[in-house]
Design a protein with these regions (language model features):
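C-terminal alpha-helical interaction appendages
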Residues: 1-65
Length: 65
C-alpha cells in the first residue's frame, strides 16, 4: 500500500514536511520496484535528507551576490 503525507511510515512522521513529502515519494517508487519496505524507508529517508540539504545549499548559493 503506498504511503501518503497523511499516512507516512512511522519513522517519517517527525521529518519536516518538505523532506517527508520527498521521502514518501521516493519510498513509494522503491516499493513499486518491489523493494522490501524497511529498506525502502531507510533509503528514501536518507535520500530525502540529502535532497533537502542540496536544495538548501543551492538556494543559499543563488542568494549570494
Amino acid at each position: 500500500m503506498p504511503w501518503t503525507m497523511d499516512h507516512p511510515p512511522a519513522s517519517m512522521r517527525n521529518l519536516p514536511p518538505k523532506v517527508r513529502r520527498k521521502a514518501v515519494e521516493i519510498a513509494n517508487a522503491l516499493l513499486a520496484e518491489r523493494m522490501d519496505e524497511a529498506k525502502a524507508i531507510r533509503i528514501a529517508t536518507a535520500k530525502a535528507r540529502a535532497w533537502a540539504l542540496h536544495e538548501q545549499r543551492r538556494r543559499e548559493a543563488d542568494a549570494e551576490p
